[in-house]
Design a protein with these regions (language model features):
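Cysteine protease-like catalytic core of ubiquitin/ubiquitin-like
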Residues: 9-13, 34-255, 263-279
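A structural/positional concept
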Residues: 2-35
C-alpha cells in the first residue's frame, strides 16, 4: 500500500517538486507496463527502500541490499535494473544497474552535484556478493578486497536541469521513460555512454514538453489505475487510521501533518512556486 497525500498530488499538478511517494507510484505503474508490453531486458526496482532517510541504520541497509539482491536474482535473465534513489524527500537520481557488468551509472541532473552517494553505494555493493553466491553470472566481474562490487559512475552524461531548479524527480522520470522507450524499441545500445550523451542534447522547449507529459501521465495513473475499482493499483478496502499511520511510518513519511492550517483557516498545500523559466 502507498499512502499519497493530497498536498503532494496538488504539488504534482502544479509542477512543484515531486515527493518520493509519487515517484514510487509512477515506477510501479511503469514496471507493470514493462511486464504487460514484454519490454525486454529491463526491470524497474520498487524504490520503497531506496531513500536515504530509510537507510539510517546498518540493519535497514542490509534489508535494502537483501531486497535488491532478490530482485536481481529473480530477474537473472535481465541486464538492466533501474533504481530511483532519493537523497531526501524530493531530490531523486536514477541509477542504472548492470550487475553482469558490475556497473552502476548515476543519472544525476545537477550540473554541479554535491550529493553524497556513500550510503546507496554500500547498499548496492552489498547486493552483489549474494547475487554471485546464488548463481549470478558476470561478464565483467569487479572485486575489491575479495568481494564483488559495482563500478560507480556518478558523473554519467544525462540531461541537466538549470541552476536553481528543484525538479530532480521529473528529470529522473524523464531518464527512466527514455531508457524504457528505447529498450522497448531495441534502440538502447551497448555503448550506454554514447546513447546518454545523445539523449542529453535535448532542447529546453523539448524538456518542458516532457515535464508536461510526465505530469499528464501521473494524472492518468491516478485516474485510471488508482481511483476506479478496476484499476491495477486500486486498494479494494478502506484502511483504518492505524493502518494509514503504520504505512506512513514504514514509508518514512510520518514527520509531517496531512495539511497545515493557516491563521485564515485556509490550507498550505505547497511551497512557493519556482520561476517558470526553471525547468
Amino acid at each position: 500500500m502507498i499512502v499519497l497525500r493530497f498536498d503532494d498530488i496538488f504539488d504534482m499538478l502544479n509542477l512543484y517538486p515531486l515527493h518520493y511517494t509519487l515517484i514510487r507510484l509512477f515506477s510501479l505503474s511503469m514496471e507493470m507496463r514493462i511486464i504487460r508490453d514484454k519490454t525486454p531486458d529491463i526491470v524497474i526496482v520498487d524504490p520503497f527502500y531506496m531513500c536515504a532517510k530509510i537507510l539510517g541504520s546498518a540493519r535497514d541497509r542490509q534489508v535494502a541490499s537483501s531486497y535488491l539482491e532478490g530482485v536481481i536474482l529473480a530477474n537473472a535473465d535481465k541486464d538492466n535494473f533501474l533504481v530511483p534513489y532519493f537523497s531526501d524527500d524530493t531530490h531523486c537520481t536514477l541509477i542504472l544497474l548492470r550487475p553482469k557488468y558490475s556497473m552502476a551509472m548515476y543519472f544525476d541532473s545537477d550540473r554541479q552535484s554535491k550529493k553524497d552517494y556513500t550510503t546507496i553505494k554500500k547498499v548496492l555493493d552489498d547486493a552483489l556478493p549474494g547475487y554471485a553466491k546464488y548463481g549470478g553470472t558476470f561478464r565483467r566481474p569487479i572485486r575489491r578486497y575479495g568481494k564483488h562490487v559495482f563500478t560507480h559512475v556518478t558523473t554519467f552524461p544525462c540531461v541537466k536541469k538549470p541552476p536553481g531548479s528543484q525538479k530532480d524527480a521529473y528529470y529522473a522520470l524523464h531518464h527512466t521513460r527514455a531508457i524504457v522507450r528505447d529498450q522497448h524499441h531495441r534502440m538502447l545500445t551497448n555503448d550506454l555512454k554514447e546513447w546518454a550523451t545523445c539523449l542529453s542534447a535535448i532542447q529546453d522547449e523539448d524538456i518542458r514538453q516532457e515535464l508536461f507529459r510526465i505530469q499528464s501521465e501521473f494524472a492518468e495513473i491516478i485516474y485510471q489505475d488508482v481511483l476506479p475499482s478496476s484499476g491495477q493499483l486500486y486498494l479494494n478496502c478502506q484502511p483504518s487510521n492505524s493502518e494509514i499511520e503504520t504505512t506512513l511510518q514504514m514509508q518514512a513519511d510520518n514527520d509531517r501533518t496531512f495539511m497545515t492550517i493557516r491563521k485564515d483557516d485556509g490550507f498550505i498545500h505547497a511551497p512557493v512556486p519556482e520561476s517558470s523559466q526553471k525547468y
